[in-house]
């Protein structure tokens, strides 16, 4: 279950003396478990900002001001770390070339495991298991855009 109540987000100004940028204004909705939902709208409508709020990236890792409530399966996303939220919530960038963190397939698989504090030797083994599971053995060092 996803609950959003009166959610607003304002990005910090991009330049000194600039004005904050409103991205979301008073958004409210509920999504029942098992639902399949698409978010559509023109460029700049706040679709990505909304998805980042659902994943807890906003307000935890972005500069700006959030008001309202975002809960995913009873977890208030503004009161939990991104690491804790990542155990239950995933987020995929619109543009894979603008990915936030990882340079290789190996790094992409390792990232959430590292955030959960899993030992490097276990991560190394898990990468091989996951690549084998999806038929990508031998792609460990490949960069996602190649």
Language-model-detected regions and their locations in the chain:
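Short helical segment in ABC ATPase nucleotide-binding domains corresponding to the A-loop/adjacent helical element
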Residues: 55, 90, 97, 103-114, ...
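Conserved ABC ATPase "signature" region
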Residues: 121-140
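Short, conserved post-Walker A segment of ABC-type ATPase nucleotide-binding domains
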Residues: 37, 48-61
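Conserved ABC transporter NBD signature motif
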Residues: 63-75
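The feature captures the beta-strand-to-loop junction immediately N-terminal to the Walker
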Residues: 40-45
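Conserved ABC ATPase signature
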Residues: 143-146
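A short, flexible loop at the N-terminus of ABC-type nucleotide-binding domains that lies
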Residues: 1-4, 9-26, 58-63, 79-81, ...
